[in-house]
Amino acid sequence: LHLSIRRQRQMCIRDRRKGINMSKKVAVIMGSDSDFPVLVPAIKRLKGMGIETEVRVMSAHRTPAAAAAFSESARENGFGVIIAAAGKAAHLAGVLAAHTTLPVIGIPVKSSTLDGLDALLATVQMPSGIPVATVAIDGADNAAILAAQMLALSDDCLAQKLNGMKREMEEGVAKKNEALQEKVAQL
């Protein structure tokens, strides 16, 4: 098993050097630059997995034509997934989804009013035929992981990275459980 995994990793490294089997890009779009701190974990996660990431500010209400144009040309510009974060009325993900067949992941951003519930409802309640996959309020890290999983459907190297990440999480939980059991034994 380890030999097989090692061989696959070597093949992925060679393939990436040749430009073979490269994942598509992920667009991370925010409705306002004030949303940037919420998106930092997603940007770091995507870049950490070697996924080319383009980050932009675009408003569903202030720059609707630019948002529509970006979304309409996203596929031909090499994008595979769009992540959209917005607070309050939070129509950005829906506007982007209306103009593309690419998967759109919405991140409702917590604002000072209603603790992000308004953004959650605006992002998740989409009409039939215009789906937006919605993560938790301020759930940027999960949005990045979901985007990576979508791209991994056609990228075995990325799938390996995701498997490695899940193994690391599993090992982390096992270590925490071990430490807990030691504390319980001392009671």
PLM region descriptions:
Residues L1-D15:
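Single conserved hydrophobic/aromatic residue that forms the stacking wall/gate
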Residues K24-R62:
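Glycine-rich phosphate/diphosphate-binding loop of Rossmann-like nucleotide-binding domains
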Residues D35-V40, T63-A67, A86-V95, L114-L117, ...:
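Short glycine/serine/threonine-rich phosphate/pyrophosphate-binding segments
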Residues A42-I43, A68-S71, A98, D115-P127:
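Active-site-proximal loop->helix
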Residues V55-E76:
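N-terminal beta-loop-helix "entrance" segment that forms/cooperates
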Residues F70-P108:
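Glycine-rich phosphate-binding loop
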Residues T113-Q160:
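Short, glycine-/small-residue-rich phosphate/pyrophosphate-handling segment
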Residues L151-L187:
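Glycine-rich phosphate/pyrophosphate-binding loop and the adjoining helix
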